[in-house]
Amino acid sequence: MRPRLYLRVGDRVVHLRYHYWGEGVVIEERHSSLEGGFCLVKVLFEDGEERSFINDLDHECCCYYSGVRIVY
């Protein structure tokens, strides 16, 4: 089964619980070639830190469920 992805490279995001991180930009997507493997995104936030998140909406730890939201 293919993963349902939430974020794409270039998306601007914020985190609902960590507003002091500032706005972030998705700079990298990684997809596992193994069945059931992780789909990850790397986000560069305004505080200068890169943070990685699970990007599969079918996974209970998806970045959407942990508070990452797209800025439109």
Describe the predicted segments one by one:
Residues 12-14, 42:
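Residue-level detector of beta-strand face positions
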Residues 47-72:
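Intrinsically disordered, low-complexity, charged/polar segments
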Residues 22, 36-42:
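Short aromatic-glycine-enriched beta-strand elements
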Residues 21-31:
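Short beta-strand-centered aromatic/proline hotspots
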Residues 1-12:
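Mixed-charge, Lys/Arg-rich low-complexity intrinsically disordered regions
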Residues 31-32, 48:
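Short active-site-proximal "capping" loops at secondary-structure junctions
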